[in-house]
From Swiss-Prot:
This is Probable cobalt-precorrin-6B C(15)-methyltransferase (decarboxylating). Its EC number is 2.1.1.196. SUPFAM superfamilies: S-adenosyl-L-methionine-dependent methyltransferases. Gene3D superfamilies: Vaccinia Virus protein VP39. S-adenosyl-L-methionine binds at residues 15, 39-43, 60, 89.
Length: 187
């Protein structure tokens, strides 16, 4: 698996590599899929998806972050592999997405409405704030699209006084859903 290079940064920072690995697993992208990311920021998830999906669209409302995505795509040899849109979702969301990643919590209700209306098969939303995780979980339930909630925390070891200690990242709440009518048992 190719390493993702992120030489260009954005204030929000990238989705961590371990979290991206779980996102990729939950999305289970194939070369037949149209993947859409809302809130591309550094492009870390977009880059991973561009290696798996046949078609990729990334939306980012902030022009400077979209430029960061563009630069990081180029640094990974994927400059022409992704359609970039400077828009605030749900505006300009494609109606033919097979898989959707929501990287931020802004307007997620409207994004989930769009996903439910268009029958997106695989939906993943990452949340780092507890209150948003609870509200977003309820939003998935209200639309009858919730299939799974995962909470995890990554810690990296470092040397401390000749032994190993751990530096912990913030926990991530991952909401997984489907608006296609398929259940997990059907997949």
């Amino acid at each position: 698996m190719a390493q993702t290079q992120l030489p260009h940064d954005a204030k929000a920072g990238p989705t961590k590599p371990e979290v991206r690995a779980v996102v990729r697993s939950k999305l289970a992208l194939t070369d037949d899929d149209h993947f859409v990311e809302v809130g591309s920021c550094t492009g870390a998830v977009t880059i991973a998806a561009a290696r798996d999906a046949g078609r990729v669209t990334a939306l980012e409302r902030k022009a400077d972050r979209l430029e960061t995505t563009r630069k990081n795509l180029a640094a990974n040899g994927l400059a022409d592999a992704v359609e970039l849109r400077n828009a605030e979702a749900p505006a300009e969301l494609p109606a033919d997405a097979d898989a959707l990643f929501i990287g931020g919590s802004r307007n997620y209700d409207a994004v989930l409405d769009h996903a439910a209306e268009t029958g997106v098969d695989r939906i993943v939303m990452n949340v780092s704030r507890l209150e948003v995780a609870g509200a977003a979980t309820q939003a998935f339930r209200d639309r009858d699209i919730l299939t799974e909630v995962v909470q995890f925390q990554v810690s990296h070891g470092y040397e401390l006084a000749g032994a190993t200690s751990f530096d912990s990242e913030n926990p991530v709440y991952m909401l997984v859903g489907s608006a296609s009518g398929d259940t997990e048992a059907d997949r």
